[in-house]
Amino acid sequence: MTQLVFHHDINQLNNLPNGTIPVHLYGMGNKKLQIAHIGNMVLDSVKRLGIKLNNQVMDFLTIAMAVTAADTFVLRKDTANGWCRSFSITLPLCQPDIWQKNKVHLEQILHFLSGDIWQFDFHAGGQLPPQPYKLSGRTKLVDLRNKDCVCLFSGGLDSAIGVIDLLEQGNSPVLVSHSYKGDKSRQPLFSNLTKMVILTNFPNLMRLHNHI
């Protein structure tokens, strides 16, 4: 089982047992000390929402960061059967009691989605929600006015269909995307191709052009 220990304070990631993968949450890590990192720009993105997150939402984001890191850093090809990985994740949260009550359910969901074995050890001391940026000319905030839902958008046709369905139902979605190093440069191309396909085949959804 691969042990991963996460913390937003890099000083808490020293002197861990051999074989443990230390991961600096919302920071830059330390190459010299072999401390990995994830989400160093995430807190800035959260601040740009212009709203203060509650602790439960922040904890959910922290768990998502940990799951993404584990899935990224531990390769399937290095496992005994070339597929199933086993993770033991130690993670600080703002309100660990809430997630401790749902730990088994979370582990089962991730096992179903990934085919991997997940074990979580939640404890106190998690990253608190950052103070949002205030509206000013220097900082561009995400425009959440009149938005009533969130939709994942990769730039491909599958996620575009999800956007179309929401718009046809009268919703106004915020589109959320993610890219890894190497494919970010291709996303504008995929997004533009998606727009062309949608606007050609769904002329009644011209308003979609303003959402992508």
List each language-model region with its residue ranges.
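Catalytic nucleophile serine of serine hydrolases
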Residues: 153-154
